[in-house]
């Protein structure tokens, strides 16, 4: 081979290498080159490493936290590179972890804590499946310096049956939940105005603080493909407690949609009925009955051009107060917009949205277990929530989201501690200043939110978010029990193939409530500031094999004696030791 020929071949390889480098920097047609390789080709495959992308950002609804979906995009590269025939080297494939359909978990801890879960699912045939989940969490209590019992139980059973056909799918769900809680929030100085200590002890012993909640539901969902009718969901819920309270709720939510000239037109319909009763009010004089039927339609039109997506919609609701014949009509803006400033790397979004929220006794009990069965139930008129934000990617595996908003809500519900009056004829276990009522007011909220998520590698992920709120009320002196600042962070990592660990922390700022105590010798009415609190939780797990995993969890590891609600201290350091087993039938 002559020197000239060698130079030509070297220049040819150099040109091809430079072309490949620049092709990585720009999204351009790289052209083609024919390369004749005379050396036998011995390919090797490096260890696979999946880059964890941040969530897709071309969503139409920027105000809600959507389910994160990771997508892998394949980019075709024009090439006529044809290596000479050779024998590929052997590749050591990583062992793929087997996936199981079912699992069982059992854990025990201090404070007499028991945590158990059982999840099973099975395909009956190609189109049908059934599933169920049983969950239990309980504690025998034991918080220091309490005057009343603080144990709790929470057990639920959920069942589902589904059927998937070519053009549509549907499923039905049913479930039952049983919960036991205690109104243990008595101040340590309760009834200290009684002259005889035995009288004080007898009064405390006469209080039965236990409350029981029961919930039964039946629901279903159907969705269709290639049809104007998109989907519909419905649910019936019956909720009751140990004091004769009863609540029924039924709703149906169909959705239709079609396209005109490539633009999507959708309409969501809703019929939401709520009816219930309490045997008596807080002072034991009269029964409380309530009922509301809300009917709404939410049409929307989606406009897209280049990097701009606009969803123009409105919400029209008619609310009927079935007990007081007080019917109202509401109109809400439902407008969202996104603009991709730099592709998926930086997206600006904004919106103005409102809706009519149906409040219920069950919803309040799940937010605050210690409410009294004497509540005033009414819907909330969420007039508008105007917001602007920016989200995107700082790097391929780091995403961010910042948002500012101004919200106006008429009839926003807040919790307030109930007063104690020794002349109250109602002597139920919640009538000693150890329960909470619900108040409503027009509340305007200015909010700032920031979030950062990162997957540093396939073994380490981190997230942090914070929210600052400023409240303005019309009639209430304060936005009771609403914190101005909340911060949360989490870190998860795989130590080895067998060991994994994680930690989460959260901070909740100060809140305000009212303490009211009235007796013959004692009359107190004061605004109480609940201290901010910081909570640290950690867990460590060991994967014995594909099926069996052991774990240990620790909650409130800083052992802060904080109060989530007035006079309701939480458990101190909590440790849970358990195991999880995965299986198939």
Task: Give a label for each model feature.
Residues 203-219, 235-306, 437:
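Outer-membrane beta-barrel transmembrane domain signature of Gram-negative proteins
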Residues 22-94:
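N-terminal periplasmic/intermembrane-space "pro-region" immediately following the signal or transit peptide
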Residues 1-27, 346, 491, 573, ...:
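Bacterial Sec-dependent N-terminal signal peptides
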Residues 99, 107, 309-313, 317-585:
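Exposed, low-structure sequence patches enriched in small/polar residues
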Residues 122-144, 266-270, 290-321, 455-470, ...:
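Surface-exposed extracellular loop regions of Gram-negative outer-membrane beta-barrel proteins
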Residues 84-86, 95-104, 108-145, 149-155:
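Outer-membrane beta-barrel translocator/receptor signature
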Residues 139-152, 173-249:
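Flexible loop and strand-edge segments within Gram-negative outer membrane beta-barrel domains
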Residues 118-122, 132, 157-163, 218-224, ...:
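Residues on the lipid-exposed face of transmembrane beta-strands in outer-membrane beta-barrel proteins
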């Amino acid at each position: 081979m002559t020197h000239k020929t060698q130079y030509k071949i070297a220049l040819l390889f150099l040109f091809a290498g430079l072309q490949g480098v620049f092709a990585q920097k720009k999204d351009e047609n790289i052209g083609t080159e024919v390369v004749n390789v005379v050396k036998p080709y011995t390919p090797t495959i490096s260890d696979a490493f999946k880059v964890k992308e941040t969530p897709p950002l071309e969503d139409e609804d920027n105000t809600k936290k959507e389910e994160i979906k990771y997508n892998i995009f394949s980019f075709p590269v024009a090439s006529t590179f044809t290596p000479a025939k050779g024998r590929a080297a052997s590749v050591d494939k990583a062992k793929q972890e087997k996936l199981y359909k079912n699992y069982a978990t059992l854990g025990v801890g201090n404070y007499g804590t028991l945590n158990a879960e059982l999840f099973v699912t099975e395909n009956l045939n190609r189109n049908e499946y059934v599933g169920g989940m049983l969950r239990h969490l309980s504690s025998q209590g034991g918080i220091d310096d309490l005057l009343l019992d603080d144990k709790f139980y929470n057990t639920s059973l959920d069942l589902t049956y589904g059927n998937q056909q070519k053009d549509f799918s549907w499923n039905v769900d049913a479930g039952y939940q049983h919960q036991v809680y205690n109104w243990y929030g008595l101040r340590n100085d309760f009834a200290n105005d009684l002259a005889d200590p035995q009288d004080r002890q007898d009064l405390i012993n006469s209080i039965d603080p236990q409350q029981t909640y029961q919930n039964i539901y039946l629901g279903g969902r159907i969705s269709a493909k290639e049809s104007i009718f998109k989907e519909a969901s419905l649910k019936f819920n019956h909720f009751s407690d140990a004091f004769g309270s009863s609540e029924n709720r039924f709703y149906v939510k169909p959705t239709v949609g079609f396209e005109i000239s490539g633009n999507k037109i959708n309409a969501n319909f809703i019929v939401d009925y709520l009816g219930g009763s309490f045997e008596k009010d807080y002072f034991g004089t009269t029964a409380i009955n309530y009922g509301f039927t809300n009917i709404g339609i939410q049409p929307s039109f989606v406009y897209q051009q280049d990097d701009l997506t606009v969803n123009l919609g409105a919400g029209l609701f008619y609310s009927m107060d079935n007990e007081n014949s007080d019917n109202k009509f509401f109109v809400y803006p439902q407008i969202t917009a996104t603009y991709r400033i730099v592709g998926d790397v930086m997206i600006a979004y904004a919106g103005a949205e409102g809706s009519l929220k149906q409040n219920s006794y069950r919803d309040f009990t799940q937010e605050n277990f210690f409410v009294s069965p004497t509540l005033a139930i009414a819907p909330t008129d969420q007039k508008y929530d105007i917001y602007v934000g920016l989200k995107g990617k700082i790097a391929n595996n780091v995403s961010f989201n910042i948002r500012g908003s101004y919200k106006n809500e008429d009839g926003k519900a807040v919790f307030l501690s109930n007063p104690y009056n020794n002349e109250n004829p109602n002597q139920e276990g919640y009538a000693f200043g150890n329960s909470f009522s619900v108040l409503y007011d027009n509340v305007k909220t200015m909010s700032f939110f920031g979030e950062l998520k990162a997957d540093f590698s396939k073994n380490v992920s981190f997230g942090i978010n914070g929210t600052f709120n400023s409240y303005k009320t019309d009639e209430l002196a304060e936005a009771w029990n609403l914190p101005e600042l909340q911060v949360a962070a989490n870190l998860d990592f795989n130590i080895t193939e067998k060991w994994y660990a994680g930690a989460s922390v959260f901070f909740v700022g100060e809140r305000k409530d009212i303490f009211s105590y009235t007796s013959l010798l004692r009359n107190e009415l004061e605004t109480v500031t609940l201290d901010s609190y910081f909570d640290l939780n950690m867990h460590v797990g060991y994967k014995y094999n594909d099926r069996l995993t052991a774990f240990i969890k620790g909650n409130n590891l800083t052992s802060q004696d904080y109060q989530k609600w007035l006079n309701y201290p939480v458990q101190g350091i909590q440790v849970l030791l358990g195991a999880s087993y995965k299986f198939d039938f």
